[in-house]
Each structure stands twice: as C-alpha cells, then as structure tokens.
Amino acid sequence: MKLPVIFSLLAWSLTMSAADYDLNKPFGFCTVTSRSDATCTYHVTGGGCYTYPLPDGFAGKVAVLTSEGPDADMEKSIENAIKHNDVVILDGSKGDFMVAGRVDITVGNKTLLGINGARLCTRWHMTADMRRVLDDAGVPQMDTHGGGGMLPNGARVREEAEYHTRRIFIEKTGDATESFRNAGVLSLRRCSNIIVRNISFVGPGSVDVGGSDLLTCTGSTNCWIDHCSFQDGMDGNFDINNQSDFITVSWCTFRYTERSYMHQNTNLVGYSDREKTGFLNTTFAFNWWGEGCVQRMPMVRVGKIHMLNNYYTSTSASNCINPRKNSEFLIDGNYFDKGVKKYYSQVDAIAVTWTANNYIAEASSLPGSMGEAVAVPYDYSVAPCSEVPEVVRAKAGATLFGK
C-alpha cells in the first residue's frame, strides 16, 4: 500500500490567509539581473503600473479595448494598441477577444491587464470531426520520435505522428500554408520589463503539428506573468526559450479540456539541449497544474528554477517536475495531490534541492536532492505546503479586477 509522504507541513507556525501570500507585486527572478548576486536588483514596472483601477494621477498612455465580436480578428488591433501605449486594458465585458495568429510584443516597458473576465482566444480550434479522423488514421499509436516524411507542401517532418496529423489537416482544410499552426495568442519577442496580468488564454486544443504556444517568451527578460489562466494550448500553454531570462510565473493555472487531442505538454523552458547556459532563470510560484496536464510542469533545460508553493492535481500526469540538461532546481513547499503518481524525474540536471517542506500524496519513494544546494538571489517566504491547496484554489488564475 502506498502511504502519503509528508515533509514538515508546519514550516511556519503563523497561519496566513490567501491574501497574505498573494503579494500583488513583482517578486522572484523577475526582480533581479543575476542568478546568484542579490545586489543586482531590477524594478519591474511594465508600462508604469500593474493594478486596476489605475493609480490616481497615472500619466502614461492607456488604451482600453473591448471585443469586436466573435468573428472579428483582433490580432492587429491588440498589437497596435500595445505598440503605441504603455498600458493596454482588455475589457471582457463585451465578449471574447479572438485572434487568428499570435500577437507579438517586440518593444519593452509594457503592461497588459485583463478586466471583467477578459479572454484571449484562438479563432481556429480542434473539432470532434478532426479528432475522429485522426483516431481513424491511428495517429495516437504512431511514433513521436521518428518515421516522418515530406508533406504535400514540401515541408519535411521528422516524427510520424506529426507528419500524418499535418497531412490530414492539409487535406481536410485545403490549406497548404498550414495557417492553423499559428493558432497561438501572445509572443514576447526580445523585449524586457513586461507585465501580463489577469488574462485567460484559450487555445485550439493541443495537437502534434509543431504549432504555436498560447504564450511564448523568446529572448525576453524581466517579465512578470501573474494571475493568468492557460487552457488548451496547441504546442504548449506557456513556453520560455531562446535565452529568455529573469522570469516570474505566479498564481497561474494550466489545464486541458476535451478540446485537446495529443501533446498536452504544458510548460517547456529551454527548446533543446543546445540552449546557451546561464539563461532561463525562472520562478514558478503558487501555480496550479490541473485537469488534463500530461507533461512539462515544467520541463527545463539550462535555467535555475525556483518551484515555490505550486499545486498539482492532474491525475493524467506522466511527468510533472522534470529537470533536464544543465538545469538547477530549488523545489520548496509544493503539493502533489492524491492521484498524481508521476510527479518527478530528472535527466542530466546539475543540481536539484528538495526541501523538507513538500507534500506528495502518493509517493512510493522519496525524491532525493543532488549536487550542491540550490539557492536564489532574492528574498521570499514559503507557505506551509499543507496550506497550498486551499490558497491556490482560492486565488490562482484570472481572479483579479472584476468578473
């Protein structure tokens, strides 16, 4: 019989509320510029504020957008608003914001806030008919590591499952350009000092076509992604790569629904073993990996990663925390609920520190620390892991600034 493994549930004797743990301000790696020197601080301001209503006397440029309707592509409208304003507020009171492709943020010092239940959604999405055709072709049983070929449009694909999925979609849609692969929402591209808060990202459903993530951070630094919800990303929900650095992901939720098909791989940090070392330093704090998540919660190459008070409930998980080549992990105060059986594995990591303050409901063996003790260059407080389920369930996701 598997018995719960409880590690020092009372790290703090002081009982705190969810509001006490939610600092409502930037913290973690986004507030520094060094992976080891605490004196190298950074003041994350985004476009000058990050709360709503905006502070009295705020002098920055502000744009407030509402939905233009369920058939309108708002990709360029949102992109232009971000380019020409310091703060962009997405007001969900008139419905969802639909985008045909990723909104690119390529300039720094920007804040993007959602209010009134703002949702950024992809126009293209998987359907029951698409899933049925893929099932009939036997795609779930196909190789995901080799056995690909050349598509009718001349593109070469390495993996068998991806090759047949894309071939079927080209034939079914008649779209040789494969525009469906661009069904992502937001891309932070080589920019810095970015704040994104209180937005729900809704994707097309995960499917193995080498497509877009809901949110991608590429070569960007000092970004704070807070209180957002991510659902049904095509390739991933939120990936961080290409020498991005000093990122904090806090109070976010990640999940998949019946819209998703394969490749429920939610958070990748480092696109390959070839990532240049010294980058990708990231804090994941008070996040919730829930229904439908299978892998990459997160999977990381290269970076120093702080896993602080995160909550895991996905019973379909085949691997949750996954340190990979040249990564370092500090794992503190996390809670793996009943039904989460595959919670951790590492391959070629430099160092992993599991503190005493973690809870694993169905552990048959304890994960061991390895290498030198991992430390982070900023102050933080750890909630007792026993409080994580209640606190994270109450506060994580797009729960700020009105419904």
Predicted features and spans:
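Extracellular "leader-to-stem" segments immediately downstream of a signal peptide or signal-anchor
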Residues: P4-S13, S17-V87, D96, M130-I168, ...
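Right-handed parallel beta-helix
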Residues: D96-G278
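Conserved catalytic-core segments centered on acid/base and nucleophilic motifs
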Residues: H227-F230, G236-N241, C252, F284-E291, ...
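Extracellular beta-rich repeat passengers
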Residues: M299-K403
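All-beta strand scaffolds that present successive hydrophobic residues in beta-strands
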Residues: L112-G114, I194-V196, C223-D226, I247-C252, ...
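Residues in short coils/turns that link rungs of repeat/solenoid architectures in beta-rich domains
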Residues: G203, D232, Y256, Y261, ...
